[in-house]
Regions:
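Extracellular loop and loop/strand-boundary signature of outer-membrane beta-barrel proteins
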Residues: 30-33, 99-104, 157-164, 206-213, ...
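Residues on the lipid-exposed face of transmembrane beta-strands in outer-membrane beta-barrel proteins
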Residues: 45-49, 115-119, 132, 175-179, ...
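Extracytoplasmic gating/loop element in the C-terminal half of outer-membrane beta-barrel translocons
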Residues: 186-222
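Outer-membrane beta-barrel signature, preferentially recognizing the C-terminal barrel domain
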Residues: 1-57, 64, 90-113, 118-123, ...
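Gram-negative outer-membrane beta-barrel transporters
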Residues: 61-200
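C-terminal beta-signal and adjacent terminal beta-strands/loops
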Residues: 138, 190-203, 227-284
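Flexible, surface-exposed loop regions and adjacent strand-edge segments
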Residues: 7-14, 72-82, 146-155, 202-209, ...
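Short loop/turn motifs that connect adjacent beta-strands in outer-membrane beta-barrel proteins
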Residues: 52-55, 106, 122-130, 143-145, ...
Length: 284
């Protein structure tokens, strides 16, 4: 464990769903000096094939954790026991604070598949490169207390608002098309993210506003242009002894909105996965 996980102290405001309402409250996170080191058994099986500028890769992986260190979720603590020792209420019973810490999760099992494809072809006195990279998350098993004891729950494909983890879409795929010519580079990038389930109860008002229990998938396109300025500009009548480039890009080319997530009282988006800022231009 890190020094921060063992001895830190942090306070912020955050939203949680109480017994009958959603409120912003003080959320404190303190260190846990009794943390144990995490241990894991890793298993990998991979194949790589390459020929004449083509490359295909496949990698199955599994990680079996013991005592994985995780930060507690204020919402999960409140859902498990609304009047527990980590919950602070005033004399009227109103929620005013939740205190979280770090803990050792007894068992966690992760598995998935990483895959990739790349190829390079000559095109109009230049070179076209196609790259595809993806991850398929098969399982993310964590323990959950139930009436029948502790059971392992697969968190993949869920928002996981009620667990000590975060949203885990099943598939992520990125593709890149690059055209290179005379030290210039033109790129088109596509970023895909699977949709996932939000099991939080949605009010009738929120339903009327278009919120639902499925967070939509996301497909974002970016473009960029990289130019070698030093190829056209000389400094002190010298050339070839420096490399000067500029890069111009548009992120979220078609100005796609972030998928809506009902996470009362924040009618918002999933900040871990999506960016609500829309189209952006960058110059480097």
């Amino acid at each position: 464990p890190s020094m921060g996980q063992m001895f830190s102290s942090d306070i912020k405001l955050g939203s949680v769903r109480d017994i009958e309402s959603s409120v912003f409250v003080r959320q404190a996170q303190i260190g846990n000096a009794d943390l144990k080191p995490a241990e894991s058994t890793n298993t990998n099986f991979g194949l790589i094939y390459g020929n004449n500028g083509n490359r295909l890769s496949f990698d199955y992986w599994e990680i079996d954790f013991e005592n994985r260190i995780e930060g507690q979720s204020a919402q999960a603590l409140l859902s498990e026991d609304p009047f527990g020792p980590s919950i602070t209420r005033n004399e009227l019973g109103d929620l005013i604070g939740v205190t979280t810490t770090y803990f050792n999760e007894e068992s966690t099992v992760l598995s998935g598949i990483d895959y990739g494809l790349s190829t390079v072809k000559s095109f109009f006195n230049g070179e076209v490169e196609l790259i595809l990279q993806g991850t398929n998350l098969i399982e993310f098993l964590t323990p959950e207390q139930s009436e029948n004891g502790i059971t392992m729950i697969n968190r993949v494909g869920k928002h996981n608002f009620d667990a000590h983890t975060h949203s885990l879409p099943k598939n992520r795929i990125n593709t890149f098309i690059n055209y290179k010519k005379n030290k210039s580079k033109y790129s088109l990038i596509a970023r895909y993210l699977d949709g996932y389930i939000n099991n939080r109860t949605i009010s009738s008002k929120a339903l009327s506003l278009g919120y639902k229990n499925k967070v939509d998938s996301s497909l974002i396109f970016d473009i960029s242009l990289e130019l070698p300025i030093s190829q056209y500009l000389q400094i002190n009548n010298n050339s070839g002894d420096y490399d000067l480039k500029t890069s111009i890009g548009i992120i979220n080319l078609f100005d796609e909105k972030a998928p809506r997530l009902y996470n009362a009282p924040d009618f918002s988006w999933d900040s871990r996965l999506h960016d609500p800022r829309g189209r952006m231009i960058r110059v480097n």
